[in-house]
Design a protein with these regions (language model features):
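FAD-binding core/adjacent interface of flavoenzyme oxidoreductases
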Residues: 1-77, 84-88, 153
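Residues at the starts of beta-strands that form the adenosine-phosphate
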Residues: 59, 92-96, 191
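Flavin (FAD/FMN) cofactor-binding core of flavoprotein oxidoreductases
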Residues: 103, 235-252
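A conserved FAD-binding loop/helix module that cradles the flavin
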Residues: 195-238, 244
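C-terminal auxiliary extensions adjacent to catalytic cores
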Residues: 253-301
Length: 301
C-alpha cells in the first residue's frame, strides 16, 4: 500500500478495468488527441472540450469495442446525448457510431428507436472492427472503410485493472478474473475476493456499477459466514438495473435478476424477472435520478 504493508485475513479487491490501446494501431500514446473518456475525470472533460470546439457540420465518430466491456449500454447512451447536444448547438453535424459488435449490446430496440428519432444526425454502423487510427488526421481505418472525423472517440478493448495481473489473479482469456461465485474468491486464491467489472462475466451479467454493488454484498455476507466457520449462502441472488438517458429528460432502463445455479456453478438469469422499458419517457428520468441517489447513499454511507 502507499504507506506501507497491511496484513489481512481476507482481502477484497475491486480492480476495475484498464485498456488495451496497443490492440489498435496508432492509438497507444495518442489518447489526448483521441480520447476514450471511459474513465471519469480528465478524459471526459477532454471529450467535452473537443465537442464544444467542433465546427457545426463536423463529424463525431465513436468506436465501440467488442463485448465484454464496462457498461454495455453506455456507448449508445453517449451517442444519444452527443446527438442531443449537437441537435441544439450544431445541427449540421453528424454522430457516427462504429460498433465492432454485430448489434447494439443492450436495450437494442429502445436505442434503435432513439437513433431513428435523431434522424440523419445519427448513423449506426455494426460490424465495424477498428484496425488503426491516425491521430494527426483523426482518421479511423476500418476493415473495409476509412472514416475521417472532427472528433474521434475510441473506446479501446478492455481487461481487468492492472492490479489483477500484477497480483497474479487467475485470468480468463488473459483479461478477466475467474471467481467462485458463492464467495467471489479468485479461483485458486482463497481469502482474496474480487468484485465488479474485473470479473469474467456470468451469462448475461453486465459490467455495471449496480452489479458491482451486488457483488460486494455477496462477498461481505460470505466473509461474515466464513469468519464464523459457516458455509456461504448456497443460493445467492444478485440484481441489476441500468438507466440510460436518450436525451436531456427521457430515459430507458433494463433490469435483471441472477440466481446461483449449483449445477452450472454460476449465476443464471431468472426467467421472467426484470425486463426493459416500454418506451423512453420523463418519468423514468426521475426514477434514474432516484436510483442514483439511493445507490450513492448505499455505497457511501
Amino acid at each position: 500500500a502507499k504507506h506501507g504493508a497491511i496484513a489481512w485475513d481476507r482481502l477484497v479487491l475491486s480492480p476495475g478495468i484498464d485498456f488495451l490501446p496497443g490492440r489498435i494501431g496508432g492509438l497507444e500514446g495518442n489518447q489526448e488527441r483521441i480520447p476514450h473518456a471511459w474513465k471519469a475525470g480528465p478524459q471526459t472533460v477532454l471529450l467535452r472540450k473537443q465537442l464544444e470546439a467542433m465546427p457545426d457540420g463536423g463529424v463525431f465518430a465513436m468506436h465501440i469495442p467488442r463485448a465484454p466491456y464496462r457498461c454495455p449500454p453506455g456507448p449508445y447512451e453517449r451517442a444519444c446525448l452527443v446527438a442531443n447536444y449537437l441537435r441544439d448547438a450544431k445541427p449540421k453535424s453528424k454522430v457516427l457510431v462504429l460498433d465492432a459488435n454485430g448489434e447494439i449490446q443492450s436495450k437494442k430496440a429502445l436505442f434503435t428507436q432513439a437513433f431513428e428519432r435523431y434522424g440523419a444526425l445519427v448513423e449506426y454502423v455494426p460490424n465495424s472492427a477498428l484496425q488503426s487510427v491516425d491521430a494527426d488526421t483523426l482518421t479511423a481505418e476500418l476493415e473495409f472503410d476509412s472514416i475521417k472525423a472532427d472528433v474521434l472517440n475510441v473506446i479501446p478493448p478492455m481487461r481487468a485493472g492492472n492490479i489483477a495481473a500484477a497480483a497474479g489473479l487467475p485470468l480468463i482469456n488473459d483479461a478477466w478474473v475467474d471467481v467462485d461465485w458463492l464467495t467471489l474468491e479468485a479461483k485458486g486464491m482463497p481469502g482474496v475476493h474480487v468484485l465488479g467489472d474485473a470479473l469474467f462475466p456470468a451469462p448475461a451479467m453486465p459490467k455495471s456499477g449496480h452489479m458491482a454493488n451486488q457483488h460486494a454484498k455477496v462477498a461481505a455476507a460470505a466473509i461474515l459466514n466464513l469468519f464464523e466457520g459457516l458455509p456461504p449462502n448456497p443460493t445467492p441472488v444478485v440484481m441489476n438495473t441500468c438507466y440510460s438517458f436518450v436525451d436531456a429528460k427521457n430515459v430507458i432502463h433494463v433490469a435483471s435478476v441472477h440466481q446461483f445455479d449449483a449445477e452450472k456453478k454460476q449465476p443464471i438469469p431468472v426467467s421472467g424477472a426484470g425486463g426493459v422499458s416500454s418506451m423512453a419517457n420523463e418519468l423514468e428520468g426521475k426514477s434514474a435520478l432516484a436510483w442514483a441517489r439511493n445507490i450513492w447513499a448505499d455505497m457511501l454511507a
